[in-house]
Amino acid sequence: MMAEQVKCASAGVSSGAGSGPVVNAELEVKKLQELVRKLEKQNEQLRSRAASAAAAPHLLLLPPPPPAAPPPAGLQPLGPRSPPAATATAAASGGLGPAFPGTFCLPSPAPSLLCSLAQPPEAPFVYFKPAAGFFGAGGGGPEPGGAGTPPGAAAAPPSPPPTLLDEVELLDLESVAAWRDEDDYTWLYIGSSKTFTSSEKSLTPLQWCRHVLDNPTPEMEAARRSLCFRLEQGYTSRGSPLSPQSSIDSELSTSELEDDSISMGYKLQDLTDVQIMARLQEESLRQDYASTSASVSRHSSSVSLSSGKKGTCSDQEYDQYSLEDEEEFDHLPPPQPRLPRCSPFQRGIPHSQTFSSIRECRRSPSSQYFPSNNYQQQQYYSPQAQTPDQQPNRTNGDKLRRSMPNLARMPSTTAISSNISSPVTVRNSQSFDSSLHGAGNGISRIQSCIPSPGQLQHRVHSVGHFPVSIRQPLKATAYVSPTVQGSSNMPLSNGLQLYSNTGIPTPNKAAASGIMGRSALPRPSLAINGSNLPRSKIAQPVRSFLQPPKPLSSLSTLRDGNWRDGCY
């Protein structure tokens, strides 16, 4: 036990007689064993806490320090509790009294343990290792048995704390990263079914994209071509002035209400549309008609359209008007009775009719621009909706009345019943003509606006609201202004030829009066029969719309003069 005395002396503790440590060696061993048991209990408690807090791995490294902390700090407060040990300590080493004034629970070996810890100032966890080394050093002393048993007991406590870390499974990064060699590693930018060479696997995503874009597959080439085609379509439709795609095709819909709402919220695409809108506003100011705000007019137009769609004019009224027109066909009275029929649909529409009429006129199957509109045309003018009992006939008649410019070409007389509606109708017809010519390429546009005979027959049936077998087809054109009939500019042969082209049998009355005006064709149809030039080339004076009724020849010249307005 000389090593213990040497260790104590190095710490400043003077040992007295040499026989003291030999007598108290067994007591020291017992005390140390009790201390080891206490440490084991603390370790068990810490293990239970660590098991409960296993979810927080940062706590796994904390358990070792607390068990080591009590021995150095606990030896001094535990001292005053055992006065009998103090006498043994005083007898064993007389110098312990002045160095440690209080009485200690452990005799001289415990201070020697503290002395060994005082030399290397390390973490408290190192407490166990110097203890084992201390007893190993003491094993060379005169009592190997007493010194040899504690090392096993003292070395046992340090083993449990690492077991907490052993419970955590270590991740083998090499085995986990082995999946990088598989094809699934490249699932982000390539199909997993394709196999690659090692050089292809080593490519970065950017290099891979560059390689694929430089060497496209047939599928990618086809996709690229289709995308370019779509982009070109969108670009050309956006660039062309008032082309069917930009102003019409994008606004096609299956319901009439949608068409009207789109036309009311029409967007000005280019300069031509701006000019058309400016003309409309100028005419409305000239007639003192559009004095109200744009919001009120749009609201009234939507209300009038909705009321018109619900069938404000019954079938009996249509039949009555058609009978009147049959009588009026021989002697042409003033057209006052007809004008109120158009007024429910035109009273509150300052400008939306123009674009809807353009849209409807270009939907004909004979259009040179978009034959794909046949579906829309068949949907609107189907020959199945010809019985007088069905509501679609009424909406077809309303749509036809808005789409065909002849119906909006009634003279602006100063009759009482036409004070409201006639300015709108004449203005709409004029702006329709100007919009057609302002778009450019007049002849092709005129021909594209002429409906085919079959479609014209459908239109005639839908306006008349009766089957062909019941009445003569001539009544189908009851809503066309009779002033156009007596047009001196239209030879009778032209009217007969055009009317025979429509597939409708010509009655005997056709020989006495011009039928061209009754055939429900738009005015551009004059270019079919020999004169391919539009009538806008003839310079004629523009007439004011606020004049008393004129003879038929002056009205026809006024009608042709409207064509000149859109050519500026």
From Swiss-Prot:
Modified residue annotations for Phosphoserine: 243
GO biological process per UniProt: cytoplasmic microtubule organization; microtubule nucleation; positive regulation of microtubule polymerization
Compositionally biased region (Polar residues): 235-245, 385-395
Pro residues: bias regions: 62-74
InterPro entries assigned to the protein according to its UniProt record, in alphabetical order: Slain (IPR026179)
Tissue: Expressed in embryonic stem cells. Expressed in brain.
Subunit structure, as described in the record: Interacts with MAPRE1, MAPRE2, MAPRE3 and CKAP5. Interacts with ZDHHC17 (via ANK repeats).
Sequence similarity: Belongs to the SLAIN motif-containing family.
Name this protein carries in UniProt: SLAIN motif-containing protein 1
